[in-house]
UniProtKB/Swiss-Prot annotation:
GO terms for cellular component: cytoplasm. The keyword Cytoplasm applies. GO terms for molecular function: ATP binding; ATP-dependent protein folding chaperone; isomerase activity; unfolded protein binding. PROSITE patterns: CHAPERONINS_CPN60. CDD domains: GroEL (cd03344). It is found in: Cytoplasm. It comes from Methylococcus capsulatus (strain ATCC 33009 / NCIMB 11132 / Bath). Pfam families: Cpn60_TCP1. Signal peptide: none annotated. The gene is groEL2. Keywords: ATP-binding, Chaperone, Cytoplasm, Isomerase, Nucleotide-binding. One of its GO terms (biological process) is protein refolding. InterPro entries: Chaperonin_Cpn60_CS (IPR018370), Cpn60/GroEL (IPR001844), Cpn60/GroEL/TCP-1 (IPR002423), GroEL-like_apical_dom_sf (IPR027409), GROEL-like_equatorial_sf (IPR027413), TCP-1-like_intermed_sf (IPR027410). Forms a cylinder of 14 subunits composed of two heptameric rings stacked back-to-back. Interacts with the co-chaperonin GroES. This is Chaperonin GroEL 2.
């Protein structure tokens, strides 16, 4: 086991603060509408230029092990806030730095770190309650566009396209972000249910111009097992042909003579048919087949339910107005399922979303809700260069998270104003002892920092602007983008309540841990082995 180096009390905390300052000073340059750029070196390819705080934080690793521990703890604040709310990473970093910096001054002056932490936690609780009171619901597309614009570093086109996507697929709909091929951002909306499985054979193609399959008014056969024998399928094929309708088969797999027979029938024009694999795997596949069954008003033909392919009736099959299939996806438009059954299924999945603890499961369940309830929107990000594309895509993803957070918990005035208004509640708040009251004062000072930094990045004097904003009430604040004072909501400068709340809670949590740190342990740096000594007579040549 390698030897360790141990640092205690003030020495440990000051080394940690040095790391916090290096990371936070780099990240906070990006805050606000006039945030500066940070250039990140890449081991290959062009450097990346970004105004995204979390991207900057992720790049920072320090040589000194103790300083690096401080930097990594603040990095945790940024990434945790990003995970929970999708934005607010820079605000969280600025708050964490301010709390740690002010807190360590008090600890060095002899205050009890545990009491300071209790005071900070008490103050955070009060500020969070104030933010909830300030919060207004975010329902109209104008407010959604404004939130998206602010989060995407004041890029209006991004805010507009996100609002448009939410309008189209609803608040529950799935919105994904992809790299586009043009210079402009584009919005593609997929109506109906789409899943990632394409045709099993190119011989099913009946639309040469799109290289896809289009089935009008088809029946849908759903089966949870592999189909290899044509004997199993014959009864269904005969009944469908007699009805003069097309057929889509969705099964675990279709191969062998079954697939060959379907292809031959399709090519000869005896029966318009197509086969695709069922989406998902394992239990998720069963659930998704059940979703498709409810959407199309059919039944999953499963031996577990005592149903077999040979005994299938037309009433067991699902129906849809139109189904489009290409090499990679299948889209079911206007399924014949009853609205009540679909609604009940959506409610059932929503209950599962509430109960699940896994982020991955939650995401997959939300996708299923969207496919049943609304649709899927794809935002294709356009840019001139690869570097710009990556940076823009990251901003669109941030903005999308922020708008979802706004819809969830509402909005507060942006530009650091909400925290200044919540500061009023801390003026009369006192702790159980002097040191706890010091903790409350530390937080009261720290929550001014986001506004100060936004103003500093815009090249103005922070103290002057702060005093003017504190004189005002309600949504009165400072627009750093235009250097004007006014109503922040009217000017469209909004922050999701969830983002501001998460940033404050995460910053205070990690800062509290740092203030109460008494020892730090790190591996000793390895001594570099010297090179070979110079050979005889080499000195003169050096």
């Amino acid at each position: 086991m390698a030897a360790k180096e141990v640092r205690f009390s003030d020495d440990a905390r000051h080394r940690m603060l040095a790391g916090v300052n290096i990371l936070a000073d780099a990240v906070k340059q990006t805050l606000g509408p006039k945030g500066r750029n940070v250039v990140l070196e890449k081991s290959f390819g062009a450097p990346v230029v970004t105004k995204d705080g979390v991207s900057v934080a992720k790049e920072i690793e320090l040589k000194d092990k103790f300083e690096n521990m401080g930097a990594q703890m603040v990095k945790e604040v940024a990434s945790k806030t990003s995970d929970v709310a999708g934005d607010g990473t820079t605000t969280a970093t600025v708050l964490a730095q301010a709390i740690v910096r002010e807190g360590l001054k008090s600890v060095a002056a002899g205050a009890n770190p545990m009491d300071i932490k209790r005071g900070i936690d008490q103050a955070v609780g009060v500020v969070v309650e104030e933010l909830k009171k300030l919060s207004k619901p975010c329902t109209d597309s104008k407010a959604i566009a404004q939130v998206g614009t602010i989060s995407a570093n004041s890029d209006e086109s991004i805010g507009q396209i996100i609002a448009q996507a939410m309008d189209t697929v609803g608040k529950e709909g799935v919105i994904t972000v992809e790299e586009g091929s043009g210079l402009q951002n584009e919005l593609d909306v997929v109506e109906g249910m789409q899943f990632d499985r394409g045709y099993l054979s190119p011989y099913f193609i009946n639309k040469q111009d799109t290289m896809g399959v289009e089935l009008e008014n088809p029946y849908v056969l759903l089966h949870d097992k592999k189909i290899s024998s044509i004997r199993d399928l014959l009864p269904v094929l005969e009944k469908t042909a007699k009805a003069g309708r097309s057929l889509l088969i969705i099964a675990e797999d279709v191969d062998g003579e079954a697939l060959a027979t379907l292809v031959v029938n399709n090519m000869r024009g005896i029966l318009k048919v197509c086969a695709v694999k069922a989406p998902g795997f394992g239990d998720r596949r069963k659930a998704m087949l059940e979703d498709i069954a409810i959407l199309t008003g059919g039944q999953v033909i499963s031996e577990e339910l005592g149903l077999s392919l040979e005994k299938v009736e037309l009433t067991d099959l699902g129906q849809a107005k139109k189904i489009q299939i290409n090499k990679e996806t299948t889209t079911i438009v206007d399924g014949a399922g009853s609205a009540d059954a679909i609604k009940a299924r959506v409610e059932q999945i929503r209950k599962q979303i509430e109960d699940t603890t896994s982020d991955y499961d939650r995401e997959k369940l939300q996708e299923r809700v969207a496919k049943l309830a609304g649709g899927v929107a794809v935002i294709k990000v356009g840019a001139a260069t690869e570097v710009e594309m990556k940076e823009k895509k990251a901003r669109v993803e941030d903005a999308l998270h922020a708008t979802r957070a706004a819809v969830e918990e509402g909005i507060v005035p942006g530009g650091g104003v909400a925290l200044i208004r919540a500061q009023q509640a801390l003026k009369t708040l006192e702790g159980k002892n002097h040191d706890q009251t010091v903790g409350i004062a530390i937080l009261r000072r720290a929550i001014e920092e986001p506004l100060r930094q936004i103003v500093a990045n815009a090249g103005e004097e922070p103290s002057v602007v702060l005093a003017k904003v504190q004189e005002g009430t309600g949504t009165f604040g400072y627009n750093a983008g235009t250097a004007e004072y006014g109503d922040m909501i009217e000017m469209g400068i909004l922050d999701p309540t969830k983002v501001t709340r998460s940033a404050l809670q995460n910053a205070a949590s990690v800062a509290g841990l740092m203030l109460t740190t008494e020892a730090m342990v790190a591996e000793m740096p390895k001594k570099e082995k010297g090179g070979m000594p110079a050979g005889g007579g080499m000195d003169d040549m050096m």
